[in-house]
Swiss-Prot record:
NDH-1 can be composed of about 15 different subunits; different subcomplexes with different compositions have been identified which probably have different functions. It catalyses: a plastoquinone + NADH + (n+1) H(+)(in) = a plastoquinol + NAD(+) + n H(+)(out); a plastoquinone + NADPH + (n+1) H(+)(in) = a plastoquinol + NADP(+) + n H(+)(out). Belongs to the complex I NdhL subunit family. The keyword ATP-binding does not apply. It comes from Prochlorococcus marinus (strain MIT 9303). It is found in: Cellular thylakoid membrane. The lineage of its organism: Bacteria, Bacillati, Cyanobacteriota, Cyanophyceae, Synechococcales. It is a multi-pass membrane protein. NDH-1 shuttles electrons from an unknown electron donor, via FMN and iron-sulfur (Fe-S) centers, to quinones in the respiratory and/or the photosynthetic chain. The immediate electron acceptor for the enzyme in this species is believed to be plastoquinone. Couples the redox reaction to proton translocation, and thus conserves the redox energy in a proton gradient. Cyanobacterial NDH-1 also plays a role in inorganic carbon-concentration. This is NAD(P)H-quinone oxidoreductase subunit L.
Length: 83
C-alpha cells in the first residue's frame, strides 16, 4: 500500500498547490520588489509623508525580494555631480 502511494503520479491537487506556491513566491520575491524599486526610483524626491511612510512599510514587507536584487541594481540618486 505504501509503495503504491509513493510511486503513484502526483495528483492534480498537489500540482495546483505547488503552482500556487510558485506563483505567490514569484510575486513576493521577484515581481513586487522590482515594481517597488521602480516606483521608489521615480518618486523619491516628490513623495509626500504618507507616501514615504507606505514606501518604508513596503520595503519592510518585501525586504527579502529587495535584498535579492540589491547587488544587481544601481539606483543611486544623481546627487550634486563633481564636488
Amino acid at each position: 500500500m505504501f509503495l503504491q502511494a509513493v510511486t503513484s503520479p502526483i495528483s492534480i491537487n498537489s500540482l495546483m498547490v505547488l503552482a500556487a506556491y510558485v506563483l505567490l513566491g514569484g510575486l513576493y520575491l521577484i515581481v513586487v520588489p522590482l515594481l517597488l524599486y521602480s516606483w521608489m526610483n521615480r518618486r523619491w524626491h516628490c513623495m509626500g509623508k504618507f507616501e514615504r511612510l507606505s514606501a518604508y512599510g513596503m520595503v519592510f514587507l518585501f525586504f527579502p525580494g529587495l535584498i535579492l536584487f540589491a547587488p544587481f541594481l544601481n539606483l543611486r540618486l544623481n546627487g550634486q555631480g563633481e564636488v
